Amino acid sequence: LVTYNSVELLINNLGEYSNDQASSLDENKLVEMLEINLFSAINLTQSVLPYLRKSDASSIINIGSVMGLTANKEATAYSISKHAFKAWNDSLREELRKEKIKVSSIYPGAVNTSSWDNTGADREAMIQTEDIAKVVGNLIDLSKTCLVEEVRISPMNF
């Protein structure tokens, strides 16, 4: 930032997962999920926003989770945090639209990452990280007059 004094692109890609149920939700676990899955993105975005405003073609790409669009009875705290992330993302997009700062969100389903280590899950059937990267690249390559608000990505057979 010192060298260039502006930023054209911010990608928020974060996540911590937990298994829990609504009927026995631990408040501390929920706070932890919100801190990681929501507040870290808010804090980073607020820190970088003055630099994004200096560019005439800025974008923020927030990578959330399909669990921000649905619910999972086995991952309540995670689902709550990702729903909150989506609400913040939608509000941010509408706020920054007038400043011509694009805010797009990607909501992937199961992605083949190390979080699936030792689970026995069929990782070849999951979304591959390269596919997410291609979607991000496509969003970046769009003209400054085109805004893709949301992209939902699902595995074919997981």
Where are each of the predicted segments found?
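Conserved NAD(P)H cofactor-binding loop of Rossmann-fold oxidoreductase domains
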Residues: 13-18
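Substrate-binding pocket helix/loop in short-chain dehydrogenase/reductase
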Residues: 21-22, 26-31
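Active-site loop immediately N-terminal to the catalytic Tyr-X3-Lys motif
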Residues: 23, 72-76
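Active-site helix of classical SDR
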Residues: 45, 81
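Residue(s) in the substrate-gating loop at a strand-loop-helix junction
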Residues: 65
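Active-site-adjacent segment of SDR/Rossmann-fold oxidoreductases
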Residues: 70, 91-101
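C-terminal helical subdomain
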Residues: 105-106, 121-158
